[in-house]
């Protein structure tokens, strides 16, 4: 597989990383008393241990240049020492804390079956395969979004909405001060995306590119099933084409 084909196939995977329920999460249609389920599953599935996932990719990587980039990523995720000022998993908990949720719930989260499968995949991808698969899954798939093409092609991007317009602030009353993680992500996003794509496109051996793409497609399938399960648990129903988004009959917009 040549480099351009590799690039386009990876971008095709990422452009499918769009979930039908996300517009409901970002428009206040999820009941406030069920929103904790989303946060708990995200935290337990990958947020809490994301520094560990990055660390596994670092340990497996034989290329000093990429290790240095992963080490910087790991240091920021684990300590917040470069930008955020606090470990990113702890800053994530500021969302539920600011919404008045019981943080003890996050100490013993029972993962949904689909979440367990996705987490098992993340563990396998970062422990049992090559550095290339570990780095691609962690730094491109997990950290990345459906808009990777804009970041990769350095297109002029629309500036993000003010923090005051963040859905958790606008619809659920989260204090803006609790968005420290969102603010940090905005500060480091550009450099992280560039480093991640440089590592994969310029250092993965041609004979390994097919395996990386196949694993990324597997990540997409498992992630989609995981988000389906979270949406269902939060009372959301996949909308029929042309219909209004559906939530359960008890739903109320916060």
Regions inferred by a protein language model and the residue ranges of each:
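Non-heme di-metal
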Residues: 1-254
């Amino acid at each position: 597989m040549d480099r351009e084909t590799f690039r386009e196939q990876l971008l095709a995977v990422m452009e499918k990383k769009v979930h039908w329920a996300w517009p409901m999460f970002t428009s206040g249609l999820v009941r406030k008393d069920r929103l904790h389920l989303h946060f708990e599953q995200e935290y337990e599935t990958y947020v809490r241990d994301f520094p560990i996932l990055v660390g596994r990719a670092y340990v497996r990587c034989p290329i000093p240049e990429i290790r240095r980039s992963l080490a910087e990523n790991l240091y920021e995720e684990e300590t917040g020492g470069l930008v955020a000022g606090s470990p990113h998993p702890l800053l994530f908990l500021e969302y539920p804390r600011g919404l008045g949720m019981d943080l003890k719930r996050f100490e013993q989260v029972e993962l949904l079956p689909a979440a367990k499968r996705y987490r098992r995949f993340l563990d396998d991808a970062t422990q049992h395969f090559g550095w290339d698969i570990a780095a691609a899954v962690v730094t491109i798939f997990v950290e990345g979004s459906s808009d990777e093409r804009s970041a990769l092609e350095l297109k002029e991007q629309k500036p993000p909405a003010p923090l005051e317009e963040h859905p958790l602030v606008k619809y659920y009353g989260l204090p803006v001060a609790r968005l420290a993680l969102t603010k940090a992500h905005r500060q480091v996003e550009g450099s992280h995306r560039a480093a991640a794509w440089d590592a994969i496109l310029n250092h993965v051996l041609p004979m390994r590119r097919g395996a990386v793409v196949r694993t990324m497609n597997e990540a997409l399938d498992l992630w989609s099933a995981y988000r389906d399960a979270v949406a269902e648990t939060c009372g959301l129903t996949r909308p029929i084409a042309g219909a209004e988004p559906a939530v359960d009959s008890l739903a109320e917009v916060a």
